[in-house]
């Protein structure tokens, strides 16, 4: 297969408490489980899942209404820890000799003439230029790769911000 190098801004979640109190669980559907099956991880993922048969709607008057996720109430979507899933995926990918991970590296831009990603090692302050046959930039809301594209001539885009804010809820068993 291809040689794959992953550069991640955050620290290695396998050695830090990256997700403690900062992330809500993911809802993984049948489609997501099929994807995990395709890469041989369905059983491991299912062991980490908590089935959710429906949702509870709370109105402003204090009334509640339980709504099943399926018409017959028999099918569930599954809740899974984002951190645990990421660790499983990283460990699985890292088990291949052609895959390597580099944590604490922030993408600060792209050199569109050479196709190189411009990275900053946030631990050492070292600047790196990384190239590959294909560069896939998934560097988030304040993307250095996107900023580089926006500065290029005749690049058209639109950007819309969602007005909602984030609210974390914690329910003790």
Predicted regions and their residues:
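Glycine-rich FAD pyrophosphate-binding loop
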Residues: 1-21
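Conserved N-terminal helical subregion
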Residues: 29-168
């Amino acid at each position: 297969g291809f040689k794959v190098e992953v550069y991640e801004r955050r620290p290695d979640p396998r050695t830090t408490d990256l997700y403690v109190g900062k992330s809500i669980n993911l809802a993984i559907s049948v489609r997501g489980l099929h994807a995990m099956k395709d890469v041989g991880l369905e059983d491991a993922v299912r062991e980490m899942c908590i089935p959710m048969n429906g949702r509870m709607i709370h109105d402003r008057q204090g009334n509640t209404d339980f709504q099943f996720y399926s018409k017959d109430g028999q099918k569930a979507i599954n809740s899974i820890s984002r951190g645990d899933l990421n660790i499983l995926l990283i460990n699985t990918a890292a088990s291949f000799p052609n895959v390597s991970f580099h944590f604490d590296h922030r993408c600060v831009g792209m050199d569109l003439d050479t196709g190189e990603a411009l990275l900053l090692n946030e631990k050492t302050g070292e600047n790196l230029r990384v190239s590959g046959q294909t560069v896939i930039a998934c560097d988030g809301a304040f993307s250095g790769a996107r900023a580089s594209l926006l500065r290029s001539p005749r690049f058209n885009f639109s950007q819309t911000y969602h007005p909602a804010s984030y609210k974390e809820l914690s329910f003790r068993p």
